[in-house]
Amino acid sequence: MRMRSPSLAASAATLAATAVVAMAMASCDRTRPTEPAFQRLDARLDARLIAQGRDIFRFDTFGDEKYWTDTLRMHEVIQAAVTPVAALGVGLKVDADALPAEVKAALGRGEVDLNSTATTLALLKLNAVVGIKGHVETVDGHETLVRVGITCALCHSTVDNSFAPGIGKRLDGYPNMDLDPGAIVALSPTVPEATKAILNGWGPGMYDPRINFDGQSTPLVLPPAYGLHGVAKETYTAEGPVSYWNAYVAVTQMHGQGNFSDPRIGVHIEQSPDLVTPKLPALREYQLSLEAPAPPPGSYDVAAARRGRAVFNGAARCASCHLGPLYTDVNLGRLHAPEETGMDPRYAARTSQKAYRTTPLRGLLQHPPYFHDGSAPTLDAVVGHYDRVRNLRLTDGQKRDLVEFLKTL
C-alpha cells in the first residue's frame, strides 16, 4: 500500500461532493479551459441507484471507524463527555423519524435526560444522530461505545427542527451550517494543542479540506449537495465531477478505506479492500436526485424580483457568467481567476486549477453565507461586493431589486 496519510485530524466535514456557493455573481471577461461537461442536462437518473445511494449517503462510513476510533479516540470522548446538549451545541442533529413514538412522547414531557451521555449512546443505538454511526455493546454490565465513524450526512444534511431545535426530519443535501467540524475534531485527546487552536478558529459551517496535506488553513463554507444534476464540475475550484470529490473526501478527509489518486495534487492512496470506489455511482446518483429547494412562500417581493431579473440580465451583467438553466458557465469549460471577481486568492492558490468556478444559483436563498470563504453574510453583501469590484454603479433601487430576484432562484 502506498499512501500519503493526512497529518492533521481531518474532519467531520466536506463529505458530499461539491461546492455550490463559490462565487455568487462571477464575472467572465477572462476564462480558462477545463475539461468538457461530464453530465448531460437531460440525463435520466436510475431509481434503484438512488435508493442505494441514499443509504450510502446517510449511513455508510466507508470503514472510517479505524480513524475516528483508533486514531482520534472519539468513542472515548463521546462516552465520557458528549451529552445531547453538548452534541446539539456543536451542531449535531437528531433524526426525529428514527425515534420510537414512546421516546418522542418522553422527550415532549421532558422526561429524557439531555445532560446524560447515556442518552447520547441510546440515540446512537437508534441510528438517530445524523451523520454519526456508533456501535454500542454491553461491557461489564455497562453500555459502552466501542466504535464510531462518520458519514456524508454529517456535513451535508440537516433537519427541519419540526420537533425541537436540532431535532426533526432530515433535509439531505442541505449544508449543516450549525456544525462546527473543527471544534468536534479538536475534542480528540490525540490532536496536538497547536492544531486544536487552528481547528477551533474555523467556526460553524466552515472546514478546510486541504489542511492535512499542505498545513495551511483557509476554511471554506460547507457547500450544499443539492441542485447538482447537469453541473459538469464540482467544488469551488472545479477539480472534477461529483464522484471525484466524493472519493477525495471519503478517502482523505473522512479517512475511509478506499482508493484515491490525483497526480495534479500529488496524492496517491491505495487500500485493500476498497470500500469507497464501488459505491461512488450510487452515491452520485442520489446526490444528483436532490433538487434545489424552492424559495419559501412570501420570502421575496414579486414585483421587485421581476424588475431584478432585468437588472440581472442587463446592468449588473450577472448573466454573462450565470447563464442557462443552471446559472453557471462551468459547463462551457470556463473558470475565473480570483482577481476577476475580487475573491480571496489564497484557497485557489492551493488547488490544481488556481481559479474559481461560477456558482450555480439554484437554492441560493437557503445557504448563506456566500462566496467560498463565507465573506458575504447576505445577498445584499454579494450584490454590494460586485457593484464595487465591477464598478457597476447600480442604484440603490437596482440593488434591492436584484437581491429580490436572487431570492427567487
Q: Model-predicted segments: where are they?
A:
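Bacterial N-terminal signal peptides
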Residues: A12-A24
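Periplasmic c-type cytochrome electron-transfer domains
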Residues: R2-L8, M23-L409
